[in-house]
């Protein structure tokens, strides 16, 4: 694999959800791209964020100030849902996640969510993304949704606390690692 040059490495802001015991086997089985790249279970706040090379002390201070002004909250993953080719768990209360995402997008308007492809993103925790490989082995999104309901459903609702936002940074090998965490309400 070719090493990614530093000026091409990306960052992302996420709410990491300590749900590995619930979702990692499912993510592994369905070859979730983020799972394969070292990204923990999460709800995306803003991706892509700033290029990694531009995230220095000043940007980190801005992020810390922004997130410290937002209140932490209790949350749950409550149900299995789907987009076109993605299967995900719905985080609730939805409005708190929408507000967190909207406030962050408003504070950093140069970095629209999903590069502008989805200007009003639906909060979600992806557990499977179907691809050409999925079609070759006979999986349809409906079958994966049903499998998710059977496998993951008994673990729902899954309670967690949203008290920080994590900055992930893409590495030269294409994998992602936690760069730092910003506490909410500090």
Spans of model-derived segments:
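Basic, often amphipathic N-terminal segments
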Residues: 1-74, 94-161, 169, 173-186
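Surface-exposed, active-site-proximal loop segments in enzymatic domains
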Residues: 86-91
């Amino acid at each position: 694999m070719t090493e990614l040059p530093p000026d091409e490495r990306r960052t992302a802001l996420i709410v990491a959800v300590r749900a590995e015991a619930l979702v990692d086997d499912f993510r592994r089985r369905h070859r979730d791209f983020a799972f394969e790249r070292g990204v923990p279970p999460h709800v995306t706040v803003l991706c892509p964020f700033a290029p990694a090379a531009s995230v220095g002390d000043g940007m980190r201070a801005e992020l810390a100030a922004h997130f410290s002004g937002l209140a932490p909250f209790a949350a749950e993953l409550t149900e299995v849902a789907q987009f076109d080719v993605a299967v995900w768990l719905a985080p609730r209360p939805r409005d708190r996640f929408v507000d967190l995402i909207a406030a962050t997008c408003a504070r950093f308007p140069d970095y629209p969510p999903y590069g502008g492809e989805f200007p009003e993103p639906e909060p979600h925790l992806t557990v499977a993304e179907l691809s050409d490989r999925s079609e070759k082995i006979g999986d349809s999104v409906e079958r994966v949704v049903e499998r998710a309901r059977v496998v993951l459903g008994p673990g729902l609702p899954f309670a967690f606390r949203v008290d920080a936002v994590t900055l992930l940074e893409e590495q030269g090998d294409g994998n992602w690692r936690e760069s730092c965490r910003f506490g909410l309400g500090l």
